[in-house]
Amino acid sequence: MEKEKNKKFDSSSFKKEEKSNLAWKKEAKATKEIIKKDDEMEVVTEESQSKNEGNFKARRKVKKVISKPKTEFSEKIVDIARVTKVVKGGRRFSFSAFVVVGNKKGKVGYGHGKANEVPDAIKKAIKDAQNHLITVPIINESTVPHEMSGKFLSSKVIIKSAPKGKGIIASGAVRAVMELAGYTDIYAKSYGSRTKMNTVKATVETLKKMRTVEEIAALRGLKVQDIIS
């Protein structure tokens, strides 16, 4: 009898945890859309005066919605996860966000943020990404100058140039980096660990190794024509 009771108790607690996981995942998806609107609009409170019949001036607060100036950088949320910390008093929940930021003109970076709420975690991740931007070379306004491979831990990425009009042929995590960096025609293949965070970091490490013909010529002390020929 005791074993049966324990089984019932375990199954019910498991179902509760499963429901809570589904709930926060839905909330995370909703906040992705809300945070975009919050970034575009700003609510400003102003005080205005109105005259009453008895020559008495009353103040009231008026809310005005003002559009924020758009920045050249755009972001993509790669991953949102709920973090559980077991302490003496029980469990403490927080959220972590992993974001890629770029201006689609050769600058890209990734960032990580952690907070008690999803929007705060995303904002922290965006700030972290903006502080760790790198400049990457873009040839013919569409592709990389040459083939290159890179790795981060057990994740490996190979990037190749593609003809104009081919598009970005890559997985979701690699595609996010390529689009925000400004590439439009790319072949990319990922190997090893397929976790989104490690794949993004491996992609950025690969892009760091890219060099234009002019840069290679300067490093070798040669002319561009000598390298091309």
UniProtKB/Swiss-Prot annotation:
One Pfam family here: Ribosomal_S5_C
GO cellular component entries: small ribosomal subunit
Domain S5 DRBM: 73-136
Keyword DNA repair: no
Superkingdom of the source species: Bacteria
GO molecular function list: rRNA binding; structural constituent of ribosome
Record key words, sorted: Ribonucleoprotein, Ribosomal protein, RNA-binding, rRNA-binding
Region (Disordered): 1-27
UniProt-listed InterPro entries: Ribosomal_Su5_D2-typ_SF, Ribosomal_uS5, Ribosomal_uS5_bac-type, Ribosomal_uS5_C, Ribosomal_uS5_N, Ribosomal_uS5_N_CS, Ribsml_uS5_D2-typ_fold_subgr
Record keyword Plastid present: no
One GO term (biological process): translation
Subunit-level organization: Part of the 30S ribosomal subunit. Contacts proteins S4 and S8.
Family the entry assigns: Belongs to the universal ribosomal protein uS5 family.
Domain description: The N-terminal domain interacts with the head of the 30S subunit; the C-terminal domain interacts with the body and contacts protein S4. The interaction surface between S4 and S5 is involved in control of translational fidelity.
Record PANTHER family: MITOCHONDRIAL RIBOSOMAL PROTEIN S5
Described function: With S4 and S12 plays an important role in translational accuracy. Located at the back of the 30S subunit body where it stabilizes the conformation of the head with respect to the body.
Identification of the protein by name: Small ribosomal subunit protein uS5
Biological source species: Mycoplasmopsis pulmonis (strain UAB CTIP) (Mycoplasma pulmonis)
Protein's gene: rpsE
